């Protein structure tokens, strides 16, 4: 369960309520307004601007396209995604791993599913604290075992030295829970949290939250309890 102080808020956004676009090669769900999906009440949450739940068919993907002034974090759920950009970077990020692109003054990149199976991923966009800066890209493998608490994948916060760096006062975290296990998170005053169970079901404030639902949170102390084995992804931002 997520238990909150009285001053905090919890807004559950069921998967079926999310924006939806099926392009054949790409089946996407949008937690916030994106491309052809527009909802004035879902333009972002704090500095979190985009959370796309993408399923990409084998041997397809996104051809070269530009980005600027955005921190783009990709969490691969199943399969793998292959990246190539105008800086000369290239790499393959597998399930459970994370890649980060700081678009800065501008970068072109392509992302393809070169596998023989569907790739599922979360792509998360966070608004940087300051515009501009030199663009960059990086990827990292993270531990997959349950019960080790939160792992900080990407962060611009002091002390998160093992995380991939981003240029925002934000962090992207993950955790794996066994059924019946709980995990706590303290969301600072004035901060915004957005939680998605990538897999499994959790209980939030005595309400059930299913896999791929979104949960918008305000500052408070929270406890998350898994009703079944679960994989969690959380963004903490201003």
Predicted regions, residues:
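Jelly-roll (double-stranded beta-helix
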Residues: 1-238
């Amino acid at each position: 369960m997520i238990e909150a102080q009285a001053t905090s808020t919890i807004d559950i956004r069921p998967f079926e309520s999310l924006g939806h676009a099926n392009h054949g090669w790409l089946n996407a769900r949008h937690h916030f307004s994106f491309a052809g999906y527009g909802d004035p009440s879902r333009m972002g949450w704090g500095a979190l601007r985009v959370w796309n739940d993408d399923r990409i068919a084998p041997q397809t993907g996104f051809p070269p396209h530009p980005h600027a002034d955005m921190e783009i974090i990709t969490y691969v759920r199943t399969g793998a995604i292959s990246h190539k950009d105008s800086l000369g970077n290239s790499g393959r990020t597998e399930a459970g791993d994370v890649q980060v692109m700081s678009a800065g003054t501008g970068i072109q990149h392509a992302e393809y599913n070169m596998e023989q199976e569907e790739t599922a991923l979360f792509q998360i966009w966070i608004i940087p604290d300051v515009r501009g800066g030199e663009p960059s890209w990086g990827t990292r493998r993270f531990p997959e075992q349950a019960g080790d608490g939160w792992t900080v994948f990407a962060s611009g916060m002091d002390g998160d030295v093992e995380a991939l760096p981003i240029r925002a006062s934000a962090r992207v975290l993950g955790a794996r829970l066994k059924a019946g296990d709980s995990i706590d998170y303290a969301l600072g005053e004035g901060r915004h949290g957005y939680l998605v169970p990538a897999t499994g079901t959790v209980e939030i404030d005595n309400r059930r939250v299913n896999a791929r639902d979104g949960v918008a949170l305000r500052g408070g102390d929270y406890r998350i309890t898994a009703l079944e084995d679960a994989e969690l992804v959380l963004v903490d931002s201003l």
